[in-house]
């Protein structure tokens, strides 16, 4: 039997997803563009909003929303296959289910040239972020900030965090 959205969200979601879904529903009337910074979590929010709309309004919302994520999450495959990434499969399934076209972008930030081994670990798939880093990086890219500058800033931030940690102080 079908599960009510509210029951599903209460069981496996979090309060922010409900808030973000409400925000998206408000976007329909405000006619404003929105960047959802996240991978599958924000795809879930978009799916909740699309489900709450009548079919005739779904493509309108899809036209206003961009999903932005990191290149690592965009390329991640959860199954041992050489096919499309798990996020791409999820987005295609949403497009088919709701009969919409979705827009998703992956930021170009890579840490392979970082001084910090902790950041280079992203390239090995050892680290997952979940703080909207892809969306923020995309905004910086679209504003013309060179990715090399972002990598240097991230290196400096790790230096500062490590320096504060060695002195027994909490990082700022």
Give names to the regions the model predicted.
Residues 1-172:
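N-terminal loops that bind phosphate or other acidic moieties
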């Amino acid at each position: 039997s079908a599960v009510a959205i509210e029951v599903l969200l209460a069981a496996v979601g979090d309060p922010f997803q409900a808030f973000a879904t409400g925000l998206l529903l408000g976007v329909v009337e405000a006619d404003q563009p929105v960047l959802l910074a996240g991978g599958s979590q924000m795809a879930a929010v978009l799916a909740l909003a699309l489900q709450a709309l009548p079919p005739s309004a779904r493509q309108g919302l899809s036209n206003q929303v961009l999903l932005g994520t990191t290149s690592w999450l965009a390329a991640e495959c959860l199954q041992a296959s050489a096919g499309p990434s798990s996020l791409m499969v999820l987005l295609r399934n949403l497009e088919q289910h709701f009969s919409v076209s979705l827009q998703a972008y992956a930021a170009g930030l890579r840490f392979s040239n970082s001084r910090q081994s902790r950041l280079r670990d992203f390239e090995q798939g050892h680290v997952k972020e979940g703080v909207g880093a892809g969306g923020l990086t995309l905004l910086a890219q679209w504003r013309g900030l060179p990715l090399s500058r972002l990598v240097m800033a991230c290196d400096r931030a790790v230096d500062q965090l490590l320096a504060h940690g060695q002195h027994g102080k909490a990082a700022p």
